[in-house]
Regions:
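Positions that flank functional sites
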Residues: 25, 68, 141
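Short, acidic/polar N-cap/turn motifs at the starts of alpha helices
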Residues: 14-18, 68-69, 98
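Acidic, His/Gly-rich catalytic cores of divalent-metal-dependent hydrolytic chemistry
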Residues: 73-177
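Conserved catalytic scaffold of divalent metal-dependent phosphoesterases
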Residues: 1-60
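Active-site neighborhood of phospho(di)ester-bond hydrolases with catalytic His/Asp-centered motifs
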Residues: 29, 60-67, 79-83
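Short solvent-exposed loop/turn micro-motifs enriched in small/polar/acidic residues
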Residues: 10-12, 64-65, 92-94
Length: 177
């Protein structure tokens, strides 16, 4: 639960942050540049992703909201979802996800990394403050109670543990390593 002061502080935050790194311009948003609550998934068609990137005037987007980490390079442009630090990725594990971006002279390396934490303790704390059982259970089971927001492709992947290779994004090339 947020205090009124914390909620006021959060409401004043920008909906988009832009920065340069590794020779690339990036926009950081919650869901998508056009809507903070828009869900973008790996299976979301290319056209909406390219349209959202184009609208920013940047080379790529870093986002969250969908809870599923992924990185895609489309026509030389980037869509990177860092995952969710506060909820497992519906992969049947308790792990949450974060990303590390490492710049060098020729581009950026993106790594999705799992975070192990005290899932039982976090679940107990959620229940103690009256948060929904479904969220508390997701922490300990690694399964989402409801997949209504997920496209069919992501729904079919429920319970399959995620693993990632790093992705290198350069103006010259990109590779998954």
């Amino acid at each position: 639960r947020l205090s009124r002061e914390a909620a006021t502080w959060m409401s004043a935050l920008p909906t988009q942050i832009r920065f340069q790194m590794g020779g690339k311009s990036l926009a950081v948003v919650h869901g998508a540049p056009s809507s903070v609550n828009q869900f973008i998934f790996p299976s979301t068609p290319v056209e909406p992703k390219l349209s959202e990137i184009s609208a920013t005037g940047c080379d790529g987007i870093i986002c969250g909201h969908s809870g599923l980490p992924f990185t895609q390079i489309i026509d030389g442009l980037l869509w990177h979802n860092a995952g969710a630090i506060g909820l497992p990725a519906n992969d049947g594990t308790r792990r949450t996800w974060f990303s590390v971006i490492t710049p060098d002279e020729q581009g950026l390396r993106f790594e999705h990394l799992p975070l192990e934490y005290d899932a039982e303790g976090a679940s107990d704390e959620m229940l103690a403050v009256g948060l929904p059982n479904e969220y508390a259970n997701a922490l300990t089971s690694g399964w989402w109670d409801n997949c209504d927001i997920l496209p069919d492709e992501e729904t079919k992947q429920q319970g399959i543990p995620l693993s990632f290779e790093s992705t290198y994004w350069s103006s010259l090339r990109h590779t998954a390593e």
